[in-house]
Amino acid sequence: MLSSLRRLVNTKYLTPVRLSSLSQTPQKSENDVKLYILEYHYVKDATEKRQPYREEHLKLASKLAKANKIILAGATEQPPTGGVLIWRNTSVEEITEFVRKDPYVQNGVVTKWTIKPFLAVVGAKEFSNDLLKV
């Protein structure tokens, strides 16, 4: 699975990405992963460069939020240097498909991205089904 994901990363705008391996957490299997973090790194002056693609990017993310796949998403820092999207009820393949379709990625606003399993153990009661039992 991760080797196929690495092949998908090779686009003209993206630098090589270090993928977090699920095998780095041997006590947990992929089936235990309930949340993922998609992290984007943006080009310099991203505020201006993302503007022509922002509406379509937000539309794509909003569709997945309505489907309960993305639970939080937004830029990091001000002015933005990247973005974070927290996913649930999904797979690495589905997140990768989102990345491939994202106008920010297609148009060079994103310079690097990573998908990491998020092994949450504490959270609000609305997320109790997403937490790992320890």
Model-predicted regions and their roles:
Residues 2, 13-134:
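Conserved, structured core segments of small domains
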